[in-house]
Swiss-Prot record:
Name of the molecule in the record: Holo-[acyl-carrier-protein] synthase
InterPro entries for the chain: 4-PPantetheinyl_Trfase_dom, 4-PPantetheinyl_Trfase_dom_sf, ACPS, Ppantetheine-prot_Trfase_dom
Known catalytic reactions: apo-[ACP] + CoA = holo-[ACP] + adenosine 3',5'-bisphosphate + H(+)
Job of this protein: Transfers the 4'-phosphopantetheine moiety from coenzyme A to a Ser of acyl-carrier-protein.
Any one Pfam family match given in the protein's UniProt record, by short name: ACPS
Binding-site positions, Mg(2+): 8, 58
Subcellular location(s) of the protein: Cytoplasm
Length: 125
């Protein structure tokens, strides 16, 4: 059974400006060390990769029907399997909320261009 869906689109330039303005403070507040390692491994795709992960975190919140005030950005981590397929790992308060709502599986799709990043999340339970 589908418990929720969420979609988010982010302008890549918006995330790039946030990084320029706030630097490491922004990066550490929003992204996990694993996400940062992957995103910064390619300077050419850095901003688009960060924007896609930002969109994924927003899409997870929308799918669960909650706001950011209840959780931390880093409670949702975008991971990749051996074939590069993205997935979401929940921790902390966000994992507790998802479990309380009966979430058993989270599907994630990401896409980005130089201008925009989009994420779609479907939560099953």
């Amino acid at each position: 059974m589908i418990l929720g869906t969420g979609v988010d689109i982010v302008a890549v330039e918006r995330v790039a400006r946030a990084v320029e303005r706030h630097g490491d403070r922004f990066l550490r507040r929003v992204f996990t060390p694993g996400e940062l390692a992957y995103c910064t491994s390619s300077e050419a795709h850095r901003a688009a990769r960060l924007a896609a992960r930002f969109a994924a975190k927003e899409a997870v919140l929308k799918a669960l029907g909650i706001g950011l005030r209840e959780v931390r950005w880093t409670d949702a981590e975008v991971c990749r399997d051996e074939r590069g397929r993205p997935s979401v790992r929940l921790t902390g308060r966000l994992a507790e909320i998802a479990a309380a709502r009966g979430a058993t599986r989270i599907h994630l799709s990401l896409s980005h261009t130089q201008e925009y990043a989009v994420a779609q999340v479907v939560i099953e339970g």
